[in-house]
A protein has these predicted regions:
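Basic, low-complexity intrinsically disordered segments
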Residues: 1-172
């Protein structure tokens, strides 16, 4: 994938992560992103950076890896998506094509519903977003995962529709 298509996939993965956290009533305060690059970057001869060898003995550009801490434990899609894309932009080399992306929620805990009130966050807006996420989740559960998608899921290079039709990463 090109860097822009990979950023779109990271956005979709973050949205899926948000749905999973919301469904299980969990929150996270840390996200980890790992991006593996395609070997064609080295094979073409243009790459001069740090390399690593995969389990097949092929030379690849060294994978990008990063973690971001969220201000407070959350399952709000706006925060998870924003921080995931920012992390992607910070750790990746835009000149390289991407082969593999892993997004992980760390330090996952039950959503106790207790939040520290401060002057910098609009709690009414956050509650509205939580209700919207739950409504979206209810629609997806009732009518299927592809019943409610963002317009970006129809862009070229988006994988959400195909991913929703898979079970364990395989065609259903």
């Amino acid at each position: 994938y090109t860097n822009e298509k990979a950023a779109l996939i990271v956005r979709e993965m973050a949205e899926l992560l948000m749905f999973r956290l919301t469904e299980k009533k969990l929150v996270t305060d840390s996200l980890t992103l790992e991006v593996g690059y395609d070997r064609e970057n080295v094979d073409s001869g243009g790459y001069r950076g740090t390399t690593q060898t995969d389990r097949y003995g092929r030379t690849l550009p060294k994978a990008a890896h990063g973690t971001v801490r969220l201000e407070v434990p959350t399952n709000l899609g706006s925060q998870i998506v924003e921080q995931s894309v920012k992390l992607f932009r910070r750790i990746t080399d835009p000149a390289l094509t991407v082969r593999r992306i892993n997004l992980t929620a760390n330090r996952v805990q039950e959503d106790a519903g207790v939040e520290q009130v401060d002057l910098f966050h609009d709690t009414q807006k956050q509650e509205k977003e939580k209700r919207l996420q739950q409504t979206m989740l209810d629609i997806r559960n009732r009518f299927g995962k592809n019943a409610l998608l963002k317009a970006s899921s129809y862009e070229e290079g988006a994988t959400m529709r195909q991913r929703n039709g898979q079970i364990g990463g395989h065609k259903a």
